[in-house]
């Protein structure tokens, strides 16, 4: 049900579907997954929006890579748990891309297709 609403939001920017999704996620655990967080700015904005508008019971962040300084910045936000696979020292970190063999960008459609296949 939520996957369908996410798909509709992504394709139609439907305010009604966004409101339905917000109600479906209230008091539930939300896991936010990103390909990495260099500065934390996007995740912080997302966390603050979700806390204010979706009111989740728990908010969990999962990242394969994020420098230690960014992880510490994220820890100051209202996040229940942060899971990071690799947290390099700030002075050795250049970009998220340096930790991937292939960092090609994928489309929203590709993400929704993958999620739909794996949720069936």
Predicted regions and their residues:
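Internal catalytic-core helix/loop-beta-alpha segment
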Residues: 1-44
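Secondary-structure transition/hinge residues
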Residues: 10-14, 54, 119
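A short alpha/beta connector and helix-capping loop motif
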Residues: 43-61
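A generic local structural motif
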Residues: 16-20, 47-49, 69-71
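Amphipathic, alpha-helical segments enriched in basic
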Residues: 21, 25, 49, 86-90
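PRPP-dependent phosphoribosyltransferase catalytic core
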Residues: 1-2, 55-120
């Amino acid at each position: 049900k939520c996957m369908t609403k996410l798909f509709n939001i992504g394709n139609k920017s439907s305010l009604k579907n966004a409101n339905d999704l917000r109600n479906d996620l209230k008091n539930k655990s939300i896991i936010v997954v990103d390909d990495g967080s260099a500065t934390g700015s996007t995740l912080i904005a997302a966390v603050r929006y979700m806390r204010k508008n979706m009111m989740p019971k728990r908010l969990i962040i999962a990242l394969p890579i994020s420098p230690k300084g960014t992880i510490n910045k994220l820890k100051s936000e209202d996040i229940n748990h942060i899971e990071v696979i690799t947290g390099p020292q700030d002075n050795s970190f250049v970009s998220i891309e340096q930790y991937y063999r292939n960092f090609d960008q994928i489309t929203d459609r590709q993400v929704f297709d993958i999620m739909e296949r794996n949720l069936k």
